[in-house]
């Protein structure tokens, strides 16, 4: 019995130390596990935030793509609608509203329709001139050249038809020359070129002419000059008549009697402005007749060269306008 107690005591102390060691190790393990869990939790939160941000960015990207596709579709529909309106304008001589429920030929719409038509006409003319130039360079026969020359004259007839329709809706747009380049506007006369100046250009480019051709061209130039002078005088008279009409009566008074007089003056002035369309039409007829007379007086090959000379002169005016607009400004 005496030997039993000490052994029991030693065993208890050993167990206690062992338990304490296990407790310490367990405590340390729990602490390390908590720290690892917190670190892992922080990483999980960052990952979740990053995933959420990626999802939001993807959602916004899809929305932007959807909006872009919708914008493209809207632009396509508007372009189709505009093409349909212009087609109706060509057929009817008016510009149709996008709603389609009523026709109108307001000044702004008429001018826009004409500008589109004129650009298309110019593109077609450029193609004709390239074809004509190529035919001349390749020494095409007179019969082949005649077909192209007649096509160019017919194309000018189409231009004056387009201008006639435009004059009905906005004659001032044609008179102002805003559909031309700045340099071209410097030489503008009643919505176009002067026939007499055109003939001077042609005569200088086609020398030598026969004696009879020179005489005929000179006579045509003189008759064109006389017609231009008559139209210019008519425009001067119209401007003076408009000024007299608008300045007649008492200015600045607002009595009922003067209001009636004012409305009467406006009605008279509107009637006189209506004659502007006639001036444009006569000037364009003169221009067309000049082309037609020119090709009758010249040989087929001379006519082809004359049409090219006029076209190249116009191209140089446009090039001059581009250089002028692009010049350095101090």
Swiss-Prot record:
Residues 1-64 are annotated as: Disordered. Residues 35-47 have a biased composition (Basic and acidic residues). Residues 72-86 are annotated as: Leucine-zipper. Residues 46-66 are annotated as: Basic motif. InterPro entries: bZIP, bZIP_sf, TGA_domain. Keywords: Activator, Coiled coil, DNA-binding, Nucleus, Transcription, Transcription regulation. Residues 111-327 form the DOG1 domain. Its main location: nucleus. GO terms for biological process: defense response to other organism; DNA-templated transcription; response to xenobiotic stimulus; salicylic acid mediated signaling pathway. Predominantly expressed in roots. It comes from the Eukaryota. Residues 44-107 form the bZIP domain. Residues 1-13 have a biased composition (Polar residues). Residues 45-98, 211-244 form a coiled coil. The keyword Membrane does not apply. GO terms for molecular function: DNA binding; DNA-binding transcription factor activity; identical protein binding; transcription cis-regulatory region binding. One of its GO terms (cellular component) is nucleus. It is found in: Nucleus. Transcriptional activator that binds specifically to the DNA sequence 5'-TGACG-3'. Recognizes ocs elements like the as-1 motif of the cauliflower mosaic virus 35S promoter. Binding to the as-1-like cis elements mediate auxin- and salicylic acid-inducible transcription. May be involved in the induction of the systemic acquired resistance (SAR) via its interaction with NPR1. Could also bind to the Hex-motif (5'-TGACGTGG-3') another cis-acting element found in plant histone promoters. Binds DNA as a dimer. Interaction with the Dof domain protein OBP1 enhances the binding to the ocs element. Interacts with NPR1, NPR3 and NPR4. Belongs to the bZIP family. This is Transcription factor TGA5.
